[in-house]
Amino acid sequence: MATITTPGYAHIQRQHGRCSTTAGRRGASNSVRFSARAVSSVPHAAAASSAPAFLPVPFVPGADAPSPSGKSAIGVPKAPRKGEEGKRLNFFQRAAAMALDAFEEGFVANVLERPHGLPSTADPAVQIAGNFAPVGETPPARALPVSGRIPPFINGVYARNGANPHFDPVAGHHLFDGDGMVHAVRIRNGAAESYACRFTETARLRQERAMGRPMFPKAIGELHGHSGIARLALFYARAACGLLDPSHGTGVANAGLIYFNGRLLAMSEDDLPYQVRVTADGDLETVGRYDFDGQLGCAMIAHPKLDPATGELHALSYDVIKKPYLKYFYFAPDGTKSADVEIPLDQPTMIHDFAITENYVVVPDHQVVFKLQEMLRGGSPVVLDKEKTSRFGVLPKHAADASEMVWVDVPDCFCFHLWNAWEEADTDEVVVIGSCMTPADSIFNESDDRLESVLTEIRLNTRTGESTRRAILPPSSQVNLEVGMVNRNLLGRKTRYAYLAVAEPWPKVSGFAKVDLATGELTKFEYGEGRFGGEPCFVPMDAAAATPRGEDDGYILSFVHDERAGTSELLVVNAADMRLEATVQLPSRVPYGFHGTFITGDELTTQA
């Protein structure tokens, strides 16, 4: 095993104007103003980890408005202009609003929250400090300066999702709680034509913007202990009085991005996806909440898997309130949905990601579970169940029901993300590649232990029911590897390489690594002192080909921010030799975010 570190690059210092949030809220003594101070190393998710949301609000598909295309099931309720909210409320609603606001400020904030302080996992001063802080929207900026040479084959849009709170928090806030914002760079003919960033216009954001303040509960930052119960009660009361409308969803769409069936979908697992369209001038516009033309009536997790061979999109949906706690389904290339397969679980479980092989889906059932009753005891509803044995379920992709699932125990294993999986017929094994995280619940709850994310090979023997597990990197080379991908043209098939963020110093990302999954050879690309980024996005040389010319024949795209200079860039790195090819100077600050994707030029022309 060898560890190879490639040099970073000579940074071109060029000052750009920073975006800053202009959204305010009515004064509250515990509101937090965003700053650009350096974030401390605390046990929340890595900058690029995606956001699991588990708002315990009954999911209501709702009767969404027609889309601009005329098809049903796409739409966001039109929000009134700011200042019109009070005009459309009747006397009872105005009185209820005043009473509930007084209850929130007088009891929830002053009695339940402020005297007790906040854990670091819910403290806005920690969670959204420095370059984790939000920015305002940026309309398309054109003709971006480029140092080096962008390979001419890269033709399309690199888009990355992230959490970007529109309003200052009024109480607890976790990095995962922010409103979704997509950042996009259009590349064509060796030039960086444009950059833009826009909020995904969720029903939640539109309503809060109309009211001029945050009103929906934040799933991780607020919903813990007695104050969390009180904030849930406030939410239900406001909805009952017609002050809020949860029927069009409560999600933030801040985690994943995928292009499927002519649509770029922004996702968080607490809601339906939202369709975002890339315009001809490189701008981003929200088409609306997308239910696959009336076929999808439940939330969908933020990491669906697109099979490169069949064109099918495979997905999961979990529920924290009622059974079935987990469902599996898939979509044909034309968007036709399969029947749901209800997967029996004894308790609601955090399932943020899963994997596919050529013939199977691989579903983790780990020890991080939801116990809403813990809020009654003053705790977090997300807990580590030490009595539970972690396991993986292997289910045929086109199974009629869960009776075809084979469960294999993998004790003391929690993989927040799974990078790939494949079948090895000679041994009746399914090989799963993921990052095993300890302490398993440290993203959500404070811990004195150092967080570790170990790249791991897990072998599931579906015949014997036994499993084995090995760390791919030796102890001498161990480094936290989180968020990344394999060559998407080989997803579900055996791969040699994975491209993963080096999540150190946690929770920042100081570079990315190319890992040989067979030998453990690690090649790092380091961003340099005071420079941090996020998820590496691998773009195959022929992004539309079913079979690449070489597995590592392509380029890595990643946003990077220089904390000393206050500037942000897009890097283009050769994945074969891990050398920098080009740097694109961006016109405004790009906060550390979550997951991204590359949309080819051909795909852009097929947008619905």
Swiss-Prot record:
Please list where the region (Disordered) is annotated: 1-26
Q: Where does Fe cation bind?
A: 303, 352, 417, 595
> Required cofactors, per record?
Fe(2+)
**Name of protein:** 9-cis-epoxycarotenoid dioxygenase NCED3, chloroplastic
Expression sites (tissue/organ): Expressed in vascular bundles of roots and leaves, vascular parenchyma cells of leaves, anther filaments, xylem tissue of anthers, embryos, radicles and coleoptiles.
Function per UniProt: Has a 11,12(11',12') 9-cis epoxycarotenoid cleavage activity. Catalyzes the first step of abscisic-acid biosynthesis from carotenoids.
Q: How is the cofactor bound?
A: Binds 1 Fe(2+) ion per subunit.
Q: Which Pfam families match?
A: RPE65 (PF03055)
Q: What induces it?
A: Induced by abscisic acid (ABA) and salt. Induced by drought stress. Induced by D-allose. Induced by infection with the bacterial pathogen Xanthomonas oryzae pv. oryzae (Xoo). Down-regulated by submergence.
